């Protein structure tokens, strides 16, 4: 990260010039899923607030640019807990060392295949070296994962959260949340009354079809139209309707997307393969801790007669953020 970036701080609203957006969105590791689940659980229980998390993240200084997204959240959560007196550094260090020890698995000296005497019957065969050696090519957990485990264990011991809270949240992000937005859009495509309700009062409309969003933030639905293209960003951090769409993609959290989409949205959309005519208006909607957006894409013309289940299968996350449109 350049000194220019550090000087500008973590929230650069429209200050970057055409830095290409990395569209790759790698699958989250277990460590990342656990860290994310812990953060969501403690904020949903009001043990901490998103404003506190953001404040402490901004206070990280140059370290903000030197560590990753989940590590920043973990470090900020730890600092909040210390400041609030939830635990002290001595207890944290003790529990952290215990967690590190739990991953300290001794290496086993396996036999040399050339010295093995075969006592079993069968067709003559040989063993490959890989049959007798451990696979040590995999990477262990990153350092911040030990911090995450320590924070979680302390909070569990204090009765603030449970193990089940975390495992349930991981499962929801894997299997529940990513499908909710698809369900909502499919119903809006098939039910004009619901579509109007969704546009007028999205949060209540979604609640009325049995989806509990588990968020304090309001939801605003913006329908794409022939005259206007809508796209969503969070210039401040990474606010996103997680309980409706799942985790935000990596590019959504990236500095290049957050800064560029504000002042050159047409170029950004082109990088996603979405070409918006010059005579069509583009509206960029900035999410925050109190307000999240859902973009309602146009229904494909070749789907007449489809039911909601069929429609939900063709709804993609990128449509609901506004970076892409259905064919």
Language-model regions, residue ranges each:
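Terminal, compositionally biased segments used for targeting/anchoring and flexible tails
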Residues: 5-16, 20-27, 39-41, 60-68, ...
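Zn2+-dependent metallopeptidase catalytic domains
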Residues: 50-51
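Glycine-rich, acidic and aromatic/proline-enriched surface loops and short helix-turn segments
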Residues: 44
């Amino acid at each position: 990260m350049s000194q220019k970036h550090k000087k500008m701080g973590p929230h650069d609203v429209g200050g970057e010039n055409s830095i290409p957006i990395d569209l790759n969105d790698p699958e989250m590791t277990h460590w990342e899923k656990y860290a994310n689940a812990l953060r969501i659980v403690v904020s949903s229980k009001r043990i901490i607030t998103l404003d506190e998390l953001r404040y402490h993240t901004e206070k990280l200084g140059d370290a903000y640019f030197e560590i990753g997204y989940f590590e920043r959240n973990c470090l900020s959560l730890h600092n909040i807990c210390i400041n609030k007196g939830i635990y002290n550094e001595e207890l944290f260090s003790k529990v952290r060392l215990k967690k590190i020890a739990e991953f300290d698995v001794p290496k086993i000296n396996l036999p040399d295949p050339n010295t093995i005497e075969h006592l079993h019957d069968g067709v003559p065969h040989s063993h490959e070296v890989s049959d007798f050696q451990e696979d040590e090519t995999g990477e262990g957990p990153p350092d911040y994962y030990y911090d995450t485990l320590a924070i979680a264990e302390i909070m569990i011991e204090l009765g603030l959260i449970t193990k089940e809270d975390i495992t349930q949240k991981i499962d929801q992000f894997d299997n529940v949340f990513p499908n909710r937005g698809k369900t909502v859009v499919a119903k809006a495509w098939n039910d004009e009354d619901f579509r109007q309700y969704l546009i007028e009062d999205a949060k209540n409309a979604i609640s009325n079809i049995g989806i509990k969003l588990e968020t304090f933030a309001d939801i605003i639905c913006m329908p794409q139209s022939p005259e206007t293209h809508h796209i969503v960003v969070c210039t401040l951090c990474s606010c996103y309707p997680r309980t409706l769409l799942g985790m935000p993609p990596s590019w959504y959290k990236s500095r290049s997307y957050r800064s560029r989409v504000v002042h050159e949205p047409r170029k950004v959309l082109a990088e996603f393969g979405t070409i918006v005519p010059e005579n069509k208006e583009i509206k960029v909607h900035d999410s925050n801790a109190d307000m999240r957006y859902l973009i309602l894409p146009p229904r494909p013309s070749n789907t007449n007669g489809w039911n909601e289940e069929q429609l939900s299968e063709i709804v993609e996350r990128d449509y609901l953020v506004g970076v892409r449109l259905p064919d």
